[in-house]
Amino acid sequence: MNEVGLKDQCFGVEVELTGITREQAAQALADYFGTVPRRDDDYYDSWYVKDEMGKEWRLMSDSSIRGEQKVGARYTSTSDPRYRVEMVTPKLTYAELPKFQECVRRVRTAGGKVNSSCGIHVHVDAANHNRQSLKNLLGIMYSKEDILFKALQVNSYRIANYCQKVREPMLQKARKLSSEETKNLTQLETIWYEGDNGSTEHYN
């Protein structure tokens, strides 16, 4: 397998925000893409917007967000769940990074904002990775995550509940796997999920 460069890496992003409703955020994206937003009456009261490539961007509810709305020139707290917005991108390529950046700008211009309850999640496509590259990635993350967490000012509540650090026992077990033991990802998954494969669980 050829080495995967940054420009070959696909990704997806979840951006949590408030200040505007999901409908307003969807309209901001639709205006940018030249399309029409679509509401889906699902559990998350989602709105969908197709971009110029036909990919769907989702605006969904997230109960962990502390809602705010603009009243006059100021933002004030609100219990209205429509102001709890999570913007979920489709699978994107490196070349689409400027499009993602412009979407963030459009939502911000429409009145979107963040507060301490908001976060951002970046999902990296593992399709071009193998067992060894994932083991290497685990080691790199372990060695750099304290610097990253400090630079991003991740608060202790989020560390405990949503973005736990790599645990050293997990790292040591992964490093000890031989090439024979990692012909498939099953054993590496077992180590990552610390027993049962919880890959279908939300925070894994």
Tell where the protein language model's regions lie, with residue ranges.
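Short, conserved phosphate-binding/catalytic loop or strand-edge motifs used
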Residues: S116-I120, V124
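C-terminal accessory/tail domains of diverse enzymes
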Residues: M1-V114, A127-N204
